[in-house]
Amino acid sequence: MRIILISAATFPSDQGIRTISAILKKAGHDVKIVFMAYSEDYSKFYHNRELNQLVNICKNADLIGVNCYVSTMPRAIQITGFLKKKLKKEIPIVWGGIHPTLFPQDCIKYADIVCVGDGEDAVLDLAKAIENKKPIDKIQNLWVKDKNGEIVKNPVRPFIDILDTLPFVDYDIEDHYILENHNLRKFKEEDLNGQIFFLTGRGCPYGCTYCSNNLLNELYKGKCKSIVRWHSVDYIIEHVLYLKKRFKTLSYFDIRDDTFSLRPLSQIQEFCEKYKEKVNMRFKCLGDPKTISEDKIKVLVDAGCTDIIIGIQGNEKTNRDIYKRGQTNEQVLKAGKILSKYKNKLAVMYDVITCNPFEDAKDVIDLIRLLQILPKPYYVSVNNLVFFPGTGIYERAKMNPKLKKIVEESSKLNYWDRNKHILLKRKDMYLVLILNLMRGSVTENRFGLMPNKLINYLLKPSRIKYNLNNPALTYIGLSFVSVMDLTRERIAKPLYRSTPVNFKVWYDKIRYRV
């Protein structure tokens, strides 16, 4: 069978769709992947010129798959509608991804089939049924719309417990296309920018109210041995060795497990020993304060870990009462002290969330003060809260009539769109603006562009009281932020994308160094 898989994500780093492709190819199907990578401004849509090229790629397909997130759903709708209108033959279109998994009732309005949950086995069964002209309405994990518009809702099958049974993800770039400057062209090695995003496991045990992982955990409750599943170390090493040999411009791996540091120490030690011996290439990973330990960080750095992202998110009260993270300031500071011991070898980025209408002024101030006492240097990434449908914080906000507009509009914004988030939520704008301006490299004397002395001056009780009641200075600051963001998105990022891979690799090495 000829199958086209389409990713509407903003970057061509989608491991889910590559895994689906690998499963289908292993079964003998002819699969091509199209990365419709586009602007991070989710209000923008594809041009007809681009979609007509997509039609040409899809015209002889027997099955089309579209990957979809809540932020890219409008584009997935546009793609699906255009294909249905322009294709001369009727080709079934299946949607998959996190948003179709959590909201199949919304997605089935546009797609013929919706895949709920892990898609590997379900899509394989679907392709086999279509190829053999068999019914598809009894396949687990699939919602199917028949010719009369009736919807069959099949239950989900258990998670794939043993991840090592999956083939290596599909990086046969000869079969891939990517959108660039309004043209769909063949994928090139240079499009990887010297890096590969990589997952060594699936699942997250935490129930953070802003995250969709909690909904996945509920969906599979009682249907799996464990929510968190890992690839074996030998599988990972064999896979990355294959990719290293395959791509000569590859400079590093970016391990994107929600919390790589969640792995037991014995596994991390085994991974680091074999990675250093056989791969010997720099890598990045993500962690959280509760699972950071001296022993883990020591072996990770020794094996070549040069960057780590740690999620702080909020102050202790916000994490406990609003985000349900169960994380204390003491744990954050303890992790910070461990990480700072390796400051000459390890770049640390802390993620925080702001622009939260459930926080009060004291919560924002406490988070700023926590950042000020964390061991330096580090990089702080300030993200603005997005209410993803179905999450705990979304449901809580939906119950408040005053937050209805915020709930509806914030999911259309990118988390970095600072000016729009602050103006939309209009809660403690002065303090939220200060926190947003602290984004960037942090030393003993400054946070991003903000001198530490200036932050302390701006946080004097008299200044806070005055500026919360008189927002003129805040609006001036927001105008400055808007110009900064516009410059970054319209000028800096396009220029960066046009630079050679060698420059991108060099820039990545120094980007979060202080």
Name each model-derived stretch.
Residues 1-237, 245:
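Acidic, low-complexity intrinsically disordered segments
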Residues 40, 103, 206, 219, ...:
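Flexible glycine/acidic-rich beta-alpha junction loops that bind and position SAM and/or redox cofactors
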Residues 62, 112, 251, 306, ...:
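Conserved acidic residues
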Residues 104-109, 296, 357-373:
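Catalytic cores of alpha/beta
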Residues 171-347, 354, 369:
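Radical SAM [4Fe-4S] cluster-binding motif and immediate context
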